[in-house]
Amino acid sequence: VGEREVTSVAIFDRDGTIVDVVRDEETGAVTVAFHPDQLRLLPGAVEGMRSLAEAGYVLAMATNQPAPAKGQFSADAVRRTNDALVERLSREGVAIAAVEACMHHPQGGPGGDPSLARACECRKPKGGMLDAIVARLGADRSRSWMLGDSVSDVQAARAAGLRAGLVFADNRCELCPLRAGPVGLAPDAHGATLAELAGAILRRG
């Protein structure tokens, strides 16, 4: 009997990692895409994802989307937007093998779905979504990555026993300390774009 092939998975956060956040031109408020027309791929995103796929990584996505719990928009809107992103990436030659979206929020909000207003094990910084993807794809945790743009993405990687990759630009001052520590939160690789981050990951071997 031959050895079972081990899968290395690269799990991506969505907003701020693959696609840009949405900014209200009048108020300056920042939110996330809740309609396919709002999806804007970030520079280097497709290039970085392709590089990892060509190196043998299976690609997946794990995203916190608490808006249905908070009454901001519907669960269907989240699903449609995620589906549209997966289709868009497919047209760019990037296949996404699994998607997990946590729609819970501990407090919820006015008009939100009360069934989603609760503490859960899937919302990052917990590792539940990553655990689900690893189990579904039969991945080797020691060879797999969580790639995101926030402290919670690094924490989720640690919780699930994965390596952590961080995307951040120099103007994201709240993330700069992560380059050096604190202990346990320093990412294993980082870059200003997904393309740069993918290069750093592949150079590690």
Language-model regions, residue ranges each:
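Hydrophobic residues in well-ordered beta-strands that form the structural core
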Residues: 20, 61-63, 166
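Active-site flanking residues adjacent to catalytic metal/cofactor-binding acidic residues
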Residues: 12-14, 63, 148-149
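Acidic, Mg2+-coordinating phosphoryl-transfer loop and its flanking beta/alpha structural elements
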Residues: 145-189
